[in-house]
Structures are given as structure tokens and as C-alpha cells.
Amino acid sequence: MKSVRYLIGLFAFIACYYLLPISTRLLWQPDETRYAEISREMLASGDWIVPHLLGLRYFEKPIAGYWINSIGQWLFGANNFGVRAGVIFATLLTAALVTWFTLRLWRDKRLALLATVIYLSLFIVYAIGTYAVLDPFIAFWLVAGMCSFWLAMQAQTWKGKSAGFLLLGITCGMGVMTKGFLALAVPVLSVLPWVATQKRWKDLFIYGWLAVISCVLTVLPWGLAIAQREPDFWHYFFWVEHIQRFALDDAQHRAPFWYYLPVVIAGSLPWLGLLPGALYAGWKNRKHSATVYLLSWTIMPLLFFSVAKGKLPTYILSCFAPLAILMAHYALLAAKNNPLALRINGWINIAFGVTGIIATFVVSPWGPMNTPVWQTFESYKVFCAWSIFSLWAFFGWYTLTNVEKTWPFAALCPLGLALLVGFSIPDRVMEGKHPQFFVEMTQESLQPSRYILTDSVGVAAGLAWSLQRDDIIMYRQTGELKYGLNYPDAKGRFVSGDEFANWLNQHRQEGIITLVLSVDRDEDINSLAIPPADVIDRQERLVLIQYRPK
């Protein structure tokens, strides 16, 4: 009976966090609008081999993540939930692997359930796991690969070991097809300390080739298909998207070595109080094979991405699966022996909630700021933000009432965030980061446009997805579409600032021409170097400029 109650509670938890509130949040640009539009175009064109964005070749990532996103929009429609359905599914599958792996290690159902709940409620997991990017997919394949490797190394028969390594190769292959060759490097680095300490080199060398074969066979059909269709894909993807992004001096998203320290700290909320103890207990218990495996799985990718020049918070998502297991194991021991860490965790959550309440007041219309984040007419959004932090502090307090039994309720600290964040985003943010909001405000003007030009790829993708058209033209800036725009058949999909006046004269009689520009909040529109327009409609950071036939 208790197991049934736990399962009902888990399903209610998943529904409140990962299902019910998702449609209330508009898509963010540039990431969510980009991936939404790529998958929409894949469904519209029926081309499941070559990814396209705005009708242009888009070689930044391989294909598998787009497949999953496309299936999400196919099943649930071109809406906010449909766009995010794939990442939510991947996150829940990863949580299922956390459950299975914990049961495999300790045969303890309560520990497995707690590890799962901790994983799903970690701030970084929730933030990325409900955000339409490819990282939840690669995290799933990496976690599946680590589970497969453990399964292979614990098998007692050659059939079991062979099956485990074959499965490892398939997961690595799908990882390569999702985000590239990092799906090969990360698992290898993660298992090496464990293999070395356990002296399991023999099994690795005897059966490892099976993983290589199954990985190659997994990637080969699509790899050959895209090489035939687009011969330069692999050169661009390997050199630009791997070497330049991570290793060279001009790498994308450059950040210092310590970049991930605050990411791990913030990402560990609402379980931050367990982080030091979980890592220390894992190190102290390093003679235990499973603990070494979890510790290595957590630390090695973190070090690898810290050394790389290019860094983003999403890169280390897979590290939090083993960390959640370590946290759950440590928390149960602390509840029995010394609940100090659990009390500290409760106080951290109270402090975070109270700090958020104060910060919300400071940036509200009633605070001391001359330019508040929310305007007076958005008072309901301020109260939503207050509710988010109040619930966080309340559940932090509740865990302290009987800490040995109530500490798991820290998982409910982000409940307000999950349910209300979509209602608390300030209009000034929505106007710049949510193209759907802009489209809703300007739908009547945009819909009849013969040509639409914009200077932002993220906005262009948002316009394309919302209006169900892929012929948006880039104006002045090419951004990440630079490579695709270099192809001969992409001629006419970019107009520079100097060419715009002539281009306008040539095309004006064909129909309404709409220019959507991103501007600074205090920028004077009249100072823009563009021909006089028939219509100007400013929505804070985005402005619609329209030219009608003469």
C-alpha cells in the first residue's frame, strides 16, 4: 500500500513539474525558437536527413535530436508543449535510468525513489529538462551509456558482457548523432578512473571493440546518407563545431576554468546542503566499487568541460544523474546518524526564498529602482514571483519541522517556480526574448507580408515557427546562418544594410515588406538608416517597420 502511495505521489510530482505548466511558458529565443523551427521544417518538408533552418542548410548539430523534437510536434502539434515534449520525455527517461541504476547498486526501493525525485527537482535538471534544447537528449544517451557499461562489467557471462558493450556502442552512436563526438569522449573519461582502480582493463580490451562496432553501425546509415547529400557536412561539423567551439583560442562561449563552480552550486538547489557531504562521503567510501563509479562519473566530465575553452551550463547536465544518487544515499545516512546537513539544507532553502522575496521587492514598481523590472500594470506578475520564493522558503521551513522525516519535502521547494514562472516573466523581457509575444501583438500586420526581414536569427526562427513559413530573410546580420547562406541556392536570403534601399525598390511592388528589428530600449527609431516607412510599430525591444506597394 505504501508503494502505491509513493507511485501516486511520484506521478503527481511529475505532472505538476513536467506536464501541466509547460504550455504556459512562451518559447525563448534563440534556442527554443531555433529547434522548434528546425523540427517544424523537417515535418513540413519530409527531409529527415539534412537539417534546415529557415530553408537553409544548418550543420551545427547532427540529426537525432531533431528527429525526437519532430516526433514531439507531430504527436502534440506545433505548440509550446509539442516543442518541449521531446526534452521532457528524455529527462523522464533519464530519471527512470537513475531509478534502475540505484536499484541495481543497492536494491533499495526507497533510495531509488529518493534519487529519482532529487534528480528531477534539481534546479539545473528542471531548467534544462523543460527547455527545448538538445542537451537533455545527449544527457540521456550518456547516462544510458554509463548504465550499459556498468551492466557489461558486472555481467558474469560472455553473453552478458557482449550485450552490455553492444548496448554501450548504440548509446554512444545515438549520442554522436545527437550532439557529436563528445558522446565518445565523455563516457571514456568517466569510466577510466573506475577501470584503473578496479583493475578491469582486461574486460575493457576484450569486449570494447563490440562497442566500437555497434557505435559505427548505429551512425553509419545516416552518416553515409548525409555525406552523399551534403559532402561538406562532416568537415564543417568536425572542425568548426568541435575543434573551434571547444579547443581553439577563438572558441565559442569562452569562460574561465572555475566557470562551472557557481553552476554546480546553483544547479544543486534545493539540495545544495547535501552537496559537500555527498561528495566527501563518496570519497571516504572510495573502496566501494559503485561509489567510485558514481564519483568518477560526476567529477571527470566536470573536469573535462572545465579545461575546455568553450563552456555552457548545459554541457554538464549528465553529471547530475550520479550526483543525485550520491546525494540520496548520503541523505538517508544523515537522517539516521547526523541530520546536520539536512538542517543546513533547509536553512539554505529558507535563505534562498527570503532573498528572492527581498530581491523581487527591490526590482518591483514599489522598490527603490528608477527602472523597475516590472511595471505598475504588471503587479500580478510581482505577486507570482513573490509566491515562487515564498513557497521555496515555506518548504525549506517545513523540512526543519521534523528533519529526519520531512527532509525529502525539499523537492517541493521549486513547485512555485514550476507552476508560476510562466506568469511572472516581465513584459520587457517577453518583448525581446519571446517572439510569440511580438507575433501576437502584430499578427494582423505580419500575416499578409510578402517578405519579412529581420536582423536576429532567434527572432527569425520565432517568426517562422509562429507564422508557419520558412522564407524569412536575414537583414544586416547572418549570425549562425552564415555557413548556410554561402551556398549558391541561398542567394537572395540575405540583404545587407547598404543594399536594402535598392532591394526595397526592386521588390516593393510585389507586396507588403516587413522589417522586424531588434533595438536597444532607449534607441531612437528615427535614427535608423532605413528608407521612410509606411508603418512603424514599436514593442519595446522589437520594432515592426512596414513598406506597402506604391
Curated annotation (Swiss-Prot):
HAMAP family: ArnT_transfer
Recorded family membership: Belongs to the glycosyltransferase 83 family.
Alphabetical keyword list: Cell inner membrane, Cell membrane, Glycosyltransferase, Lipid A biosynthesis, Lipid biosynthesis, Lipid metabolism, Lipopolysaccharide biosynthesis, Membrane, Transferase, Transmembrane, Transmembrane helix
InterPro entries assigned to the protein according to its UniProt record, in alphabetical order: ArnT_tfrase, Glyco_trans_39/83, LipidA_mod_glycosyltrf_83
Membrane topology: Multi-pass membrane protein
Function, as annotated: Catalyzes the transfer of the L-Ara4N moiety of the glycolipid undecaprenyl phosphate-alpha-L-Ara4N to lipid A. The modified arabinose is attached to lipid A and is required for resistance to polymyxin and cationic antimicrobial peptides.
Record lineage: Bacteria, Pseudomonadati, Pseudomonadota, Gammaproteobacteria, Enterobacterales
Catalytic activity of the protein: 4-amino-4-deoxy-alpha-L-arabinopyranosyl di-trans,octa-cis-undecaprenyl phosphate + lipid IVA = lipid IIA + di-trans,octa-cis-undecaprenyl phosphate
Name recorded for this polypeptide: Undecaprenyl phosphate-alpha-4-amino-4-deoxy-L-arabinose arabinosyl transferase
Main location: membrane
Organism: Escherichia coli O6:K15:H31 (strain 536 / UPEC)
Keyword Secreted in annotation: no
GO CC, any one term: plasma membrane
